[in-house]
Amino acid sequence: MQFEITTEYIKLDSLLKGVNIVGSGGEAKLVIADGEVRVNGVVELRRGRKLYPGDRVRLGDHEFGVERAAGAV
C-alpha cells in the first residue's frame, strides 16, 4: 500500500495514524518503542523519524510505501 504525502516528509508516528494502523499517538509511541516497526527493513525506535518518498514502513503484516502526491511541490 502506498501513502501519499504533499510535504517534504512525514513523521513515523503521523504515518501510522494516517494509515489507521494505530488509533492514537500514544498507541503509535508504544508499538514503536516495543520495536515492532521497521523502516526500510531496520527496526526504528524513534517516533519522530522523518520519512521521505521511497521509504518503506512495516508493522506486522502491514507494509506501506511513502510517495509524493501528484502535483505536490
Regions found by a protein language model. Name each.
Residues 1-7:
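A detector for short, charged/polar N-terminal pre-domain segments
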Residues 44-73:
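C-terminal structural segments of small proteins and small subunits
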Residues 1, 35, 60-64:
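Generic structural motif recognizing short loop/turn segments at the entrances and edges of beta-strands
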Residues 7-53:
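A basic, amphipathic helix-loop patch mediating RNA/tRNA/ribosome contacts
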